[in-house]
């Protein structure tokens, strides 16, 4: 029996690695996918072999993650429940893809992961595996074998598995960092400063603001302060720049896929800055009808990704609309980073629908104001008539005008 295990090197997956050998007599192949987490990958590989893995794969997928996943999220202004930029959720389909590739290569019929039965990741992993490799058996030991934290820690001590004294559970990649556990489970308590690594507090942020200019092509960031660069590099640089100004801290109540409400704390400096800049450029370059409808599409796209439905055909259909709309989203946006805020202060585009000659109140305006009166009459006609009907309001002037018109016809 060969099993491919998504391996982080943490307590859960290290305990699972040993247990699958003991309980099932399995040969376990471990896979670690690098999506930008700040881990010691050499130590993770050492641990994998130490605890019995017959083979270990380290896969650097950072650039693929940026170009094929984060890119889509930016174009979709992806914020689940208007807050969470989907950092963890976006990475799961890519990790699943790599697990399936290894399983097929190694002839393994079982894919295992360390997800609990309470979180969203079990949905994302299981649905993804079933979509890409329907014949695979999915093993979820923490949930299926009802492993508790206390039991795992006791087992780890007996088998020489290092037990971290960290209070918080961390998941990170280039797009964001999520923090769970400890006092954060009480939503009434402010997150202590110790939980944050990517961002400084507002109190410690510089008093002087910093300005960044982000260039977009077809809705995708392609330059920072006039320098062309790949999306991965741009995100990493912006995480550092925006983070030092306290931008990107998120603390909100989130509805999980399994029906639980949870308090979630994130750091996402680049994500917050880029999405804000992108949305502003859309306002400059898209019609109000496209913007209005796209907000619905974006929200649904975010919901699908959050809930593990990456392989749902609706996602691709929504992306068809998004990609068409984004053809016009080209230009530059200047953002002021200051004391936890990312404030758009300037934008320009060759595709701008803003015309200063139309918008100005100065004498060189080209807008014919006389047209407004007739427009207003037509625009609000049904609303005014409905109000009058419901409230018994009748215009005698209108009646007189109608009578005069009838006489003219006679």
From Swiss-Prot:
List of residues binding ATP: 6-14, 114
Pfam family, any one: Arginosuc_synth
Subunit structure: Homotetramer.
Annotated PROSITE patterns: ARGININOSUCCIN_SYN_1, ARGININOSUCCIN_SYN_2
Major place of residence: cytoplasm
Classification via Gene3D superfamilies: Argininosuccinate synthetase, chain A, domain 2 (3.90.1260.10), HUPs (3.40.50.620), Single helix bin (1.20.5.470)
Subcellular location field: Cytoplasm
Catalytic activity, as annotated: L-citrulline + L-aspartate + ATP = 2-(N(omega)-L-arginino)succinate + AMP + diphosphate + H(+)
Pathway terms, separated by semicolons: Amino-acid biosynthesis; L-arginine biosynthesis; L-arginine from L-ornithine and carbamoyl phosphate: step 2/3
Keyword tRNA processing: no
CDD domains tied to this protein: ASS (cd01999)
Binding site for L-aspartate: 116, 120-121
Entry EC no(s): 6.3.4.5
Any Gene Ontology biological process: argininosuccinate metabolic process
GO CC term, one of those recorded: cytoplasm
Similarity-based family: Belongs to the argininosuccinate synthase family. Type 1 subfamily.
UniProt KW Ligase keyword: yes
Name listed for the protein in its UniProt record: Argininosuccinate synthase
Binding site residues for L-citrulline: 84, 120, 124, 169, 178, 254, 266
NCBIfam families found in the cross-reference section: argG, PRK00509.1, PRK13820.1
Residues annotated as signal peptide: none
């Amino acid at each position: 029996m060969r099993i491919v295990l998504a391996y982080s090197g943490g307590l859960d997956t290290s305990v699972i690695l040993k247990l699958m050998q003991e309980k099932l007599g399995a040969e376990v192949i471990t896979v670690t996918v690098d999506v930008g987490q700040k881990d010691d990958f050499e130590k993770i590989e050492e641990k994998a072999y130490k605890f019995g893995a017959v083979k270990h794969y380290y896969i650097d997928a950072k650039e693929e993650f940026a170009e094929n996943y984060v890119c889509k999220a930016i174009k979709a202004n992806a914020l689940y429940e208007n807050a969470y930029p989907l950092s963890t959720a976006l990475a799961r389909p890519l990790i699943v893809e790599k697990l399936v590739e290894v399983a097929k290569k190694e002839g393994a019929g079982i894919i295992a992961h360390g997800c609990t039965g309470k979180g969203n990741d079990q949905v994302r992993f299981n649905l993804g595996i079933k979509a890409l490799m329907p014949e695979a058996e999915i093993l979820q030991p923490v949930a299926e074998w009802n492993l508790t934290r206390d039991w795992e820690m006791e087992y780890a001590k007996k088998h020489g598995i290092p037990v971290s004294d960290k209070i918080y559970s961390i998941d990170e990649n280039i797009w964001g960092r999520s923090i769970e556990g400890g006092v954060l489970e009480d939503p009434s308590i402010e997150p202590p400063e110790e939980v944050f690594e990517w961002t400084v507090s507002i109190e410690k942020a510089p008093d002087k603001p910093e300005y960044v200019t982000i260039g977009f092509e077809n809705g995708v960031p392609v330059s920072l302060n006039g320098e062309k660069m790949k999306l991965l590099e741009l995100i990493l640089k912006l995480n550092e720049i925006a983070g030092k100004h306290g931008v990107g801290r998120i603390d909100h109540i989130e509805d999980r896929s399994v029906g639980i409400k949870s308090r979630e704390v994130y750091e996402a400096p680049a994500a917050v800055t880029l999405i804000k800049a992108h949305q502003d450029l859309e306002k400059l370059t898209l019609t109000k009808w496209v913007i209005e409808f796209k907000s619905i599409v974006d929200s649904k796209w975010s919901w699908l990704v959050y809930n593990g439905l990456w392989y749902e055909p609706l996602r691709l259909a929504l992306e068809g609309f998004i990609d068409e709309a984004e053809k016009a989203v080209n230009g530059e946006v200047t953002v002021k980073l200051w004391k936890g805020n990312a404030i758009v202060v300037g934008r320009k585009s060759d595709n701008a629908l803003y015309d200063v000659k139309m918008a100005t109140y100065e004498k060189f305006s080209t807008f014919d104001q006389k047209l407004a009166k007739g427009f207003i009459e037509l625009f609000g006609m049904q609303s005014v008539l409905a109000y009058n009907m419901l409230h018994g309001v009748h215009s005698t002037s209108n009646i007189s005008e109608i009578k005069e018109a009838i006489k003219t016809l006679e």
